[in-house]
Every structure is written in C-alpha cells, then in structure tokens.
Regions:
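Acidic, two-metal ion nucleic-acid-processing modules in DNA metabolism proteins
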Residues: 1-128
C-alpha cells in the first residue's frame, strides 16, 4: 500500500509551476534534431511548427521578432537542428515546446537535397 504521508501533495497550478521550474532550469538551451512535419503562421506573425523523428514529436515556436534572424525558412519535410529554450505553458492544458532562436539544415546531405529540389522547381518555372 502507498504511504500518503511521504508523498507530496500539490494543487494543479502549484504542480505545473514546479514542473515549469524543473524543466526550464535543467534545459536552458538545447539543440533538437528532427524533421518539420507541420508549419503554421499565426495572425500575429509567430510560426508554430512540429518537429518529429521516428518515435516522437515536439512542438516549437518562432516568435515574430526572431524570424528576421533565421537563415532558412521552415518548410515541411526539412530535417533541421533547432536551437532554443524548452518552455512550458499551462493555461488550459499543460504543454512544453521549444522556443526557437536558430534553425540549421541537419547535415550536408539534407542541404544538397534542398538545393536540388529548389533547382528543379526553378527549372520548371524556367527561372534557372
């Protein structure tokens, strides 16, 4: 049987705040490698995206004021390394995401593939 005396008890918001502090203090800046599987631009300008690998997904956001510093535009199917901070949000549903500061193409092969795809697209339009 579980001994309730030694188990901490929290209010929901109290637990969410504790969770936020643990996550955000232990994962200050991180680099996450994954494929972009979804991209949405909000009316206020921020970009919401989803990164995935074989087993998991992670939400990410690029705030409007940081978009001008990006070297590449996020596109579905692009394999990237996103650098940023892990943050939590618990207004209606507790979630965590990466607040992205920088995006890099993951590997030389992915970069060459991107260049080749763009070249073909421009050739179809007779611009290359």
């Amino acid at each position: 049987m579980i001994d309730k005396i030694n188990i901490p008890e929290f209010e929901v918001s109290e637990f969410n705040q504790a969770f936020k502090e643990v996550i955000e203090s232990n994962f200050n800046y991180v680099r996450i490698k994954g494929e972009i599987s979804e991209v949405k631009t909000a009316t206020r300008g921020q970009i919401y995206l989803t990164l995935k690998d074989e087993d998991s997904i992670l939400s990410g956001v690029i705030w409007d004021q940081k978009k001008k510093y990006l070297d590449i535009n996020p596109e579905i199917g692009l394999e990237i390394i996103a650098t940023g901070r892990i943050t939590t949000w618990s207004r209606y549903k507790t979630t965590y995401q990466i607040d992205i500061d920088k995006i890099e193409i993951a590997g030389e092969g992915a970069l060459l593939k991107l260049i080749e795809e763009r070249k073909k697209r421009l050739q179809k339009k007779r611009l290359f």
